[in-house]
Amino acid sequence: MKKTIKFLTALFSSASLLMSVPALAEYRTFDDGNITYGIFQAKPEEVQLHWKDAEGKDYQSLTRLKNALEPSYNVKMIMNAGIYSMNNTTAGLWIEHGKELNALNTKSGKGNFHVQPNGVFAIAKNKPYILTTSAYQKSKLKPDFALQSGPMLIIHGKINPQFRASLESYHKRNAVCLTKQNELLFLMTIKGEP
């Protein structure tokens, strides 16, 4: 019997969001001006991260990952996750099934990953967490799955002050968030520009 996974994330060499989402109760869209966003509500126990296959090779595409997983899982949604280098190595922390594949990155530098504070999304014992990198570093959390990315958009209910109205980056983006009720939501730009 196949296990159902309603949300999978993967690290790929393409920044574009490549996914096909069926009409699910957990998925909805909303429009804000000229932009359409998708929101997917997931249960933490249904979320997994996948970077490399059994031979240690990067999946390279969402289709390849989906094909690899479908014999064992009913895949409901896949999206890219994290920030990575040109050689397909994640820029920061990456943990799959409790095994650390890449260490936490606390270095300063240029680019989106280093806009501070950046953060860590983690699932430990089926509970989701979103922490700043420094808070994660101080925590005793032992996640089953975790990835470090950046920058954090909202911190404790307030927009990250590093973002200014004059910043212009109209690339399609995706994000993970927790509601006040600790519901896990994944958001993505579907179409449009401001």
Question: What function would you assign to each model-found segment?
Answer:
Residues 35-38, 117-118, 170-175:
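Short glycine-rich loop/turn motifs
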Residues 1-7:
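Positively charged n-region of N-terminal signal peptides that target proteins for export
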Residues 75-77, 119-120, 128-130, 151-152, ...:
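Structural motif
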Residues 9-19:
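Bacterial N-terminal signal peptides
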Residues 85, 89-165:
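Active-site-adjacent helix-turn-beta-strand microarchitecture at beta-sheet edges
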Residues 144, 148, 155-194:
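Domain-core and long-helix interface of multi-subunit machines
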Residues 54-58, 135-139, 188-193:
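Short, solvent-exposed aromatic-acidic interface loops
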Residues 21-112:
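Zymogen propeptides
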